[in-house]
């Protein structure tokens, strides 16, 4: 982020006069501890991870690469997606989606379901609510918005994404127990 002195008039148009930089601020948001291991766990089990964000797709792609998400270099600016067919092709082709609106998140979840994918979605903001409602499995972070927690099927109380492998293992254990019990009655 650069702060500068500018004598011209500021508006939506590009700057027309010389700007003199007076400060440079570097911002960084490090990858959370355990993220690489968590994504590796899912990759080894054939789980396809998609990253859907309202941020710049180039930035999101770089962060996804750093986190070890497979095919993170395949990104798209969601503002370029216009038709239902665009979304269907995009979920087949891309891993990272940037500049995504809340309604587009929902459309992307629906497009993945149209591909016969079982869709699990994590989210913590009001902007995630529509997509969380449509996902086959919705997971919210307790530290996020009340709205996301209310619509989610599962809330991570410690808001730690690295707990996801243990959540999946617990879910599989429950399903296996139900299947074993059901087979006794058949």
Segments (PLM) and residue ranges:
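Signature of the cytosolic headpiece of P-type E1-E2 ATPases
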Residues: 1-61, 85
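Residue-level signature of catalytic and energy-coupling elements of molecular machines
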Residues: 3, 19, 42, 55, ...
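Proline-centered turn/helix-capping motifs that create local helix->coil transitions or kinks
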Residues: 11, 68-72
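A general structural signal for stabilizing positions within well-ordered secondary structure
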Residues: 13-16, 129, 146, 155
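Acidic, divalent-metal-coordinating active-site segment for phosphoryl/phosphodiester hydrolysis
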Residues: 36-38, 56-67, 103-111, 125-135
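Short glycine-rich hinge loops at helix-strand junctions in the catalytic core
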Residues: 46, 68, 116
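Membrane-embedded transport module
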Residues: 71-121, 125, 135, 140-186
